[in-house]
Structure formats: structure tokens, C-alpha cells
Curated annotation (Swiss-Prot):
This is HTH-type transcriptional regulator BetI. Repressor involved in the biosynthesis of the osmoprotectant glycine betaine. It represses transcription of the choline transporter BetT and the genes of BetAB involved in the synthesis of glycine betaine. The keyword Cell cycle does not apply. Pathway: Amine and polyamine biosynthesis; betaine biosynthesis via choline pathway [regulation]. The gene is betI. It comes from Stenotrophomonas maltophilia (strain R551-3).
Length: 196
């Protein structure tokens, strides 16, 4: 009989090993055996906890989505109630170190690519997109008419994704500060245009 409390530890080991494997060789070349070996566990443990490689990728994506949600929540809690500050906090959470380190970026790129072919990952991606849009729209709605708020939210969501994607593909160190400044400029432009 397994020791009490071992399952969460093993699951975490396997998820972290999945991140490392994606970082080192990519998901296409990864096998359950490769990931299990990286975690120092048997392939049978992967099957026991996750079923197969897709189940493990699903769990890994849930983990990185959870980390994103926590980062955004942390920045928002520190930002105060002003809508502009809340919008900036959402931007900051998306460019948090947990989301822009090399491993996280490769995991996100793998997730986005796989979500085009795996319905469960596509569902997770849609939920993530909807959460971002909803959070942005709520804050813009506090200062802009609803149709304009929706448009501004869509634009900022696309800008966040675009800045992140371009930053991930250029190689080298991701310039989070530059990306933040560009996104902040978009927020300021939208809010100033509404004031005219």
C-alpha cells in the first residue's frame, strides 16, 4: 500500500519532469519512458496517475495555467482598485517570470500547438482565453462604453499574446519590461481616446 501523501508528490515530480523534457527535447520526441526517467520513476507510475502521455500533457498544462492564474491574482491583489492599475496588473501577471522563463515558454508553445489537435487541450486554451478576455473586459467596462470596452479587451488580449509569442521566438532573454511598456501604452491610448 502506498504511503499517504505520496501521490501529490509523484504527480508533481512527473509534471516537472514533463516541463524539463519539453524544454530539452520537445514533446514530439518525448516518451512516457523519457519523462518517467527524468522524474526518477517508472513508466507504470505515469500510466497509474495520468493514463498516457496526453493525460500527462493535460496535467502539465493545467499546472502552467494554474501558475498563470496565481501570478495574475498576485499582481492584481497588490495593484489597488483603479481600473488602469488592474489592467496593468493583468499584463504584469502574463509577463511574470513564471510565464516567460525558457522552460515555461517552450511548454506554452507546445500547449498552443497541441491544442489545435487535442480537444481537451483546446478546451483548456479556450478557458484561458476567455478568462483573460473577461478580466480585461471587466476593467475596461469600468471606464468605457461596453462595445468599446469589448474591443479594447480583445485588442489587449491579442497584444499580450502577440508580444509573448514574438518574445518567445526571438531567442535569448525575453524583454518583459519592454513588452509591459508596449501593453501599458495600449491601455493608456484606449483610455485617453475614450476621454476625448
Amino acid at each position: 500500500m502506498p504511503k499517504k501523501g505520496v501521490e501529490p508528490v509523484r504527480r508533481e515530480q512527473l509534471i516537472r519532469a514533463t516541463f524539463q523534457t519539453i524544454d530539452e527535447i520537445g514533446m514530439a520526441d518525448a516518451t512516457v519512458a523519457t519523462i518517467a526517467k527524468k522524474a526518477g520513476l517508472s513508466s507504470g507510475i505515469v500510466a497509474h496517475y495520468f493514463g498516457d502521455k496526453d493525460g500527462l500533457l493535460n496535467a502539465a498544462m493545467r499546472q502552467i495555467l494554474r501558475e498563470l492564474k496565481e501570478a495574475v491574482a498576485r499582481y492584481r491583489a497588490d495593484a489597488g482598485d483603479d481600473p488602469r492599475d488592474q489592467l496593468r496588473a493583468i499584463v504584469d501577471g502574463n509577463f511574470d517570470d513564471s510565464q516567460i522563463n525558457g522552460t515555461a515558454m517552450r511548454v506554452w508553445l507546445t500547449f498552443w500547438a497541441a491544442s489545435m489537435h487535442q480537444p481537451e487541450l483546446a478546451r483548456l486554451q479556450r478557458a484561458n482565453d476567455q478568462r483573460l478576455f473577461s478580466n480585461l473586459c471587466h476593467q475596461f467596462n469600468r471606464l468605457l462604453p461596453h462595445p468599446q470596452a469589448r474591443l479594447a479587451a480583445r485588442g489587449l488580449a491579442a497584444m499580450i499574446d502577440g508580444l509573448w509569442l514574438r518574445g518567445s521566438l526571438v531567442g535569448g532573454q525575453f524583454n518583459a519590461e519592454k513588452s509591459r511598456r508596449i501593453a501599458y501604452g495600449y491601455i493608456d491610448f484606449q483610455l485617453q481616446a475614450a476621454a476625448l
